[in-house]
């Protein structure tokens, strides 16, 4: 098993970057916060072992570009670990997600109807494991994906 030797965090918001910097001070390894979005990651190609994404893929403006950048910076057989919410498989729920998506985008920049699992594989990742389930809460925002994918 490998140890974490360094963490890079991407955050375009200065306010949130400052909050993350405060939290990162107690980490047992160096944390470097980068003023960038996932669509243009300021790191060398094939320089990262693992990318962790938690509740962010719904709000990235250009998801395809972001997943392409994640693939670019990951080393061969690198891992994308994700915990995300997205489009529910139930037609009645997904219709509500589609209806409410403009409101969520306007209020929180969130796209609750993205097909996260399909987007990851369409970007060229190999799905290693994935679980899909409703978590507690309103069904139109509680369908979640947790898993890991590898670069191919």
Q: Which sequence ranges carry the predicted segments?
A:
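Short alpha-helix
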Residues: 108-124
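A short acidic, Gly/Pro-enriched loop at the edge of an enzyme's catalytic core
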Residues: 39-51
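A short SAM/SAH-binding and catalytic strip from SAM-dependent methyltransferases
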Residues: 49-62
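Core SAM-dependent methyltransferase catalytic element
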Residues: 129-152
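A short glycine-rich, Lys/Arg-flanked "PGG" loop and its adjoining helix->strand segment in the class I
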Residues: 64-76
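Short, glycine-/aromatic-enriched active-site segment of Class I SAM-dependent methyltransferases
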Residues: 91-106
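Class I SAM-dependent methyltransferase SAM/SAH-binding core
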Residues: 1-40
């Amino acid at each position: 098993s490998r140890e974490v030797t360094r963490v890079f965090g991407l955050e375009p918001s200065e306010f949130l970057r400052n909050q993350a910097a405060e939290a990162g001070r107690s980490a047992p390894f160096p944390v470097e916060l980068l003023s960038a979005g996932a669509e243009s990651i300021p790191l060398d190609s094939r320089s990262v072992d693992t990318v962790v994404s938690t509740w962010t893929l719904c709000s990235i403006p250009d998801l395809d570009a972001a997943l392409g950048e994640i693939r670019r910076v990951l080393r061969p057989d690198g891992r994308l670990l994700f915990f995300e919410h997205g489009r529910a498989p139930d037609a009645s729920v997904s219709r509500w997600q589609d209806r409410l998506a403009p409101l969520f985008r306007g209020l929180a920049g969130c796209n609750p109807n993205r097909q996260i699992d399909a987007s990851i594989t369409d970007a060229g990742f190999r799905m290693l494991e994935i679980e899909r389930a409703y978590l507690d809460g309103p069904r139109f925002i509680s369908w979640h994906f947790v898993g890991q994918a590898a670069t191919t």
